[in-house]
Amino acid sequence: VSDAKKVADALNIPHYVVNYHKKFKDDVIKYFISEYAKGRTPNPCVRCNNTVKFGSLLKDCLELGADCVATGHYARIEQDEKTGRYLLKKGLDVRKDQSYVLYTLTQDVLKHFMLPLGNYSKEKTRELAGKMNLPVANKPESQEICFIPNDDYKAYLKAKAPHILKPGD
């Protein structure tokens, strides 16, 4: 939250804090545990993007009067000139592409989002952030799931849902 506030201040745009803790727990964490309990591999990032970021967040932003929301996903949204449909496309930096975690987004959602980082490499993004003196320019990147400490799924499940851990054959 503090990084977002610093960036918003640097860009001179309003910053709002909305608590999605319960929604995240109910829609993402419970799903994650439930899928593991069923022996399936969950994709909590897809779930979070669909229900929290591009669901509740979009709804709240529109209610605050925003026309669109920009995120830091490395993907692109383009509107087809002939059909008017919005197309979700891979980010130009294929090493950082995140279009795969956005595949569930509908036309109604896509029309309200901008993904400006999808047109740049990670290196170029950092360079631009540095030139703009953004406080996150050199922040280490993360590849793991945001709520799993040290990317240790087993320890997380053992702590949060020990009843689902059963030895295999």
Model-predicted segments: where are they?
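Internal nucleotide-binding/catalytic subdomain
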Residues: 104-168
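ATP-dependent adenylation/nucleotidyltransferase module used to activate substrates
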Residues: 1-103, 114, 124, 130
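Short polybasic amphipathic segments
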Residues: 88, 168-169
